[in-house]
Each structure stands twice: as C-alpha cells, then as structure tokens.
C-alpha cells in the first residue's frame, strides 16, 4: 500500500514536522508584537501567548475623554492580537509547507 519503506518514511516526516512545529510554537510564544491605535497614540506590546506586556499612552490623551481612551486601548490590544495571529499563520505555513488546516482548527492542536 505504501511501497518500500513508505510508511516508515511517512512516520519519520510526521515526526520531523511535529518537532519543527514545537520549535515554532516556542518561538511564537516568546515573540512580541506591538499593536497601535489612534495613529500611534496608544501602543500595546503583547507576547505570542497573548499576554499584554506593556501599554503606552501618549500624554496628550490623558486630558481627553476617558471613554475614548478606553476605546483606543481596546483597539490597540485587538490590533496586537491580530498581528500575532497573522504571524502565527505565516510561521506555521512555513513549517507545514502551506498545507491548509481544516476550518476552525488552530495551532497548536
């Protein structure tokens, strides 16, 4: 069915891919991305594990409406999370050779 050594080679390839994916997942968890809103007036630094490390607010916003500032912080967090997701997809595509995952399935499994 798999030919000479086909099943063994397939298992070896799967193991190698799994090892590469584990390395990439560790790399992703350590990376940091900066999300911005309000043309850079609010910046949020987030890790690949979606932990917020830092929030920077331009002093000019401290005099403005509290609700607007809250909205800008939320938008910056969402921007950072979106950037992390895009980066994860790119890195995982490199490991899987562009192999698409079934809809709704995320990495890590």
UniProtKB/Swiss-Prot annotation:
Domain of life assignment: Bacteria
Gene Ontology CC entries for this record: bacterial nucleoid; cytosol
UniProtKB keywords: Cytoplasm, DNA-binding
A GO MF label: DNA binding
Listed Pfam families: YbaB_DNA_bd
Keyword Protein transport: no
Subcellular location: Cytoplasm, Nucleoid
Chief location: cytoplasm
InterPro entries linked: YbaB-like_sf, YbaB/EbfC
Residue stretches in coiled coil: none
PANTHER family the UniProt entry points to: NUCLEOID-ASSOCIATED PROTEIN YBAB (PTHR33449:SF1)
Purpose: Binds to DNA and alters its conformation. May be involved in regulation of gene expression, nucleoid organization and DNA protection.
Protein family (similarity comment): Belongs to the YbaB/EbfC family.
Subunit text: Homodimer.
HAMAP family: DNA_YbaB_EbfC (MF_00274)
NCBIfam families: DNA_YbaB_EbfC
Protein's name according to its UniProt entry: Nucleoid-associated protein Sbal223_1770
């Amino acid at each position: 069915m798999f030919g000479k050594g086909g099943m063994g080679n397939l298992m070896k390839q799967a193991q190698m891919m799994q090892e590469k994916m584990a390395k990439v997942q560790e790399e992703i968890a350590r990376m940091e991305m900066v999300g911005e809103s309000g043309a850079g007036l609010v910046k949020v630094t987030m890790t690949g594990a979606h932990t917020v490390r830092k929030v920077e607010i331009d002093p000019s916003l401290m005099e403005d409406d509290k609700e607007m500032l809250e909205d800008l912080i939320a938008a910056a967090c969402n921007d950072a999370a979106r950037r992390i997701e895009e980066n994860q997809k790119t890195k995982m595509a490199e490991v899987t050779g562009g192999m698409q995952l079934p809809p709704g399935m995320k990495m890590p499994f």
